[in-house]
UniProtKB/Swiss-Prot annotation:
The lineage of its organism: Eukaryota, Metazoa, Chordata, Craniata, Vertebrata. Residues 201-208, 279-297 are cytoplasmic. Residues 41-57 have a biased composition (Basic and acidic residues). Residues 68-79 have a biased composition (Low complexity). This is Transmembrane protein 178A. Residues 26-179, 230-257 are extracellular. It is a multi-pass membrane protein. It comes from Homo sapiens.
Length: 297
């Protein structure tokens, strides 16, 4: 096999691996995870003996869970009916009065991706029981459209407006993340097709075009991943922090799905670099050989 064909085959293999990793990342839900078990244990130690034994593991009243059946009284404040409830709706329904202490906040182990946010099973017995009985939803869809503003109890109007503006900005960050990832997959697929065509037609030209498409995919992936990180940071630093930030002892961080996306980015940049750099390297070698022959003559 000629060196150019070998480089093209290697680039095509890297790009196909990158495509598989990127599709895996997009369609899995383990981009970001939270684990409040350590926080829960510290809260239980601090209030030991204050609650009955069967209530020590409950951090959230049942009325604030995303229930499937008829909504509690507080949920009637939502315009458009109870169908808008999701795992985060307790933030808007409780008001600040119910969140005067960190241990009074409803915190459960969750994992989320681009499309859904779900509870982990097997970590908290209360949420496990409610999910198994069909009372609470295990997963809720992440919104990519702006819904009607939610009326918030016990929160000043200015703060309510700030929360709604933050929701709007967060929605834009999510759209940018999903949009650029979709474009990355489309451009990467085109690059793989062009790299395959290079084995049969205009090898030098098609290899160069495939390299440019691979590098463009890398740019789209970089924008998307950085925007996703910005959306997570923005969400955790929203006001009021008593509602949106996490306590210091809650473990949270990125999970394996986003690492698949970063590995995909590395593979595609390597593939694009090979396709772009090889023609220049080969030309340099040819020029050196010609100069060597001329000098001997």
């Amino acid at each position: 096999m000629e060196p150019r064909a070998l480089v093209t085959a290697l680039s095509l293999g890297l790009s196909l691996c990158s495509l598989g990793l990127l599709v895996t990342a997009i369609f899995t839900d383990h981009w970001y995870e939270t684990d409040p078990r350590r926080h829960k244990e510290s809260c239980e130690r601090s209030r030991a003996g204050a609650d009955p034994p069967d209530q020590k593991n409950r951090l959230m009243p049942l009325s604030h869970l995303p229930l499937r059946d008829s909504p509690p009284l507080g949920r009637r404040l939502l315009p458009g009916g109870p169908g808008r409830a999701d795992p985060e709706s307790w933030r808007s329904l409780l008001g600040l009065g119910g969140l005067d202490a960190e241990c009074g906040r409803p915190l459960f182990a969750t994992y989320s991706g681009l499309w859904r946010k779900c509870y982990f099973l097997g970590i908290d017995r209360d949420i496990d029981t409610l999910i198994l009985k069909g009372i609470a939803q295990r997963c809720t869809a992440i919104k990519y459209h702006f819904s009607q503003p939610i009326r918030l109890r016990n929160i000043p109007f200015n703060l309510t407006k700030t929360i709604q503006q933050d929701e709007w900005h967060l929605l834009h960050l999510r759209r940018i993340t999903a949009g650029f990832l979709g474009m990355a997959v489309a451009v990467l697929l085109c690059g793989c097709i062009v790299a395959t065509v290079s084995f049969f037609w205009e090898e030098s030209l098609t290899q160069h075009v495939a390299g440019l498409l691979f590098l463009m995919t890398g740019i789209f992936c970089t924008i998307s991943l950085c925007t996703y990180a910005a959306s997570i940071s923005y969400d955790l630093n929203r006001l009021p922090k008593l509602i949106y930030s996490l306590p210091a002892d809650v473990e949270h961080g990125y999970s394996w799905s986003i690492f698949c996306a970063w590995c995909s980015l590395g593979f595609i940049v390597a593939a694009g670099g090979l396709c772009i750099a090889y023609p220049f390297i080969s030309r340099t070698k040819i020029a050196q050989l010609k100069s060597g022959r001329d000098s001997t003559v």
